Amino acid sequence: MKKHIITILVFTTGLNLFSQSNIENQIFDIGIESIDSFREFLSIKNDANFKNEMKPLIEWGINNFKKYGFEVERLETPELPLLLASKVISEDLNTLLIYLQFDGQPVDNSKWDQENPYKAVLKERINDEYKITDWGKLDNLTFDDIKKDDLRIFARSASDAKGPVMMILNALEIMKRNNIELEYNLKVIMDFEEEISSPNLADAVKKYSSKLKSDALLIFDGPKHPSNLPTLTFGARGISDITLITYGPI
């Protein structure tokens, strides 16, 4: 069952302008403010096996990156498009490309201890079990309170991988409120078919290579370190498989 600890990642560029405590307070406040938006995001179906249901998710991606001054274009493929959001500060600056995944694993309602996997619920840990609690419990809490009660949001893709999308948007919101300017160009590629092995991604990268051209790539996905600290992983393994054919009685 997917769960998302209420925590927000913020870009570090320009944070030296503010005290650490001020930034931490803003991260928490904006994280709480964004809960309703996150719940709305989680309510949008994102199973790439049902392509006719993915349009609202694609529109959500377009609208939410446009709010932060990005130019967003569809990179068409034979099936679902990719989205490319670009914010070019200067052609003389380096460019960072961020990869985000929007789709999620198929849903088996029978395995979820809640009304609907696409209807997010807040749970707290009681005697080693997570029990549904009221969203109002988040009112007037500190981050230490949330950690103490082990409050978590349960919904399909709350962690894998709508959580990282919301983290990026909240980071952009903090930068906007504090008038922090990017010191590099930023591009974001949004994949709506990752959980079905991104069948069109490789060809799209070749076809749109000039649009995707960047100096560095950050894949905003994957598990955190067991310490629960923010993690940067330098390099990623690929995947391989074998087909084993047996003959005779088993």
Q: Model-found features: residue ranges?
A:
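Sec-dependent N-terminal signal peptides
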Residues: 4-13
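Solvent-exposed residues in well-ordered beta-strands and their adjoining turns
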Residues: 12, 88, 245-249
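Sec/Tat signal peptide C-region and signal peptidase I cleavage site
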Residues: 15-19
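Acidic/His- and Gly-rich active-site-bordering loop/insert found
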Residues: 21-154, 165, 177-182
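Short beta-strand segments
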Residues: 99-101, 218-221, 245
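Acidic/histidine-rich catalytic neighborhood of metal-dependent amide-processing enzymes
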Residues: 147-235
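Flexible glycine/proline-rich, aromatic-decorated loop/lid segments
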Residues: 233-247
